[in-house]
Amino acid sequence: MDYNELIKQAEELQGELEEIRHDLHQHPELEFDMEYTKPYIKTKLEQMGYEVEEVGKAGLVTTISGNKPGKTILLRADMDALPIREEADVEFKSLCEGKMHACGHDMHATMLLGAAKLLKVHQDEIEGTIKLEFQPAEEVFKGSEDMIKAGLLENPKVDAAIMFHVVAGVPMPTGMIMVPGGGVSMTSCEQYHITVTGKSGHGSMPNLSIDSITAAAQIHLALQEINSREIAPGEY
């Protein structure tokens, strides 16, 4: 596979992919509600010649194998939006009030569709198998778990997974790719709850009560200091 030829073929898809991205951007959907997005992407893949499997509550998976043995690599793109009202004045502005693609998942899904098209062109050159995953509910941290439980990483068993995420508002030129070391491709977060129980008291004797608001504020400040003072930038 000649790199320059591959880039040329990718550039030739730009107009088509821009139309797809604008269409997806106009129809943002939340969490597992993929009534427009899922069939839209499924149809695009089927038009390329892929057999598409619905995995989990709203996910899509398809595979492509070459004529040479090799490992199975998963390429993953998320496709859900956020409950945010879009104020940008663009032709492809969200048509769904209170919803918008504010995190670039419309672009992620579009790029994976573009990759799927190029992989079909170069299928004979693929060593092993490439599995393509379109994941819902990334913003609520539920989509990946749902698809994994439904067998995403099996049949064939996945050896490694690759995801990508666009970024804005940083001093980087368009087209640059950042790859952190240590096998970690993207930072994430975890959710947890802390319950602070107070104790009521009379206004004349506050020393006998427990001020839960002040205690919670101190906890919040202490947790923030861990990130800003105890962990070096770039560490996880």
Q: What are the residue ranges of the model-derived segments?
A:
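Histidine/acidic-residue-rich, glycine-tolerant segments that coordinate divalent metal ions
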Residues: 82, 90-100, 107, 124-236
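Acidic/His- and Gly-rich active-site-bordering loop/insert found
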Residues: 2-101, 110-127
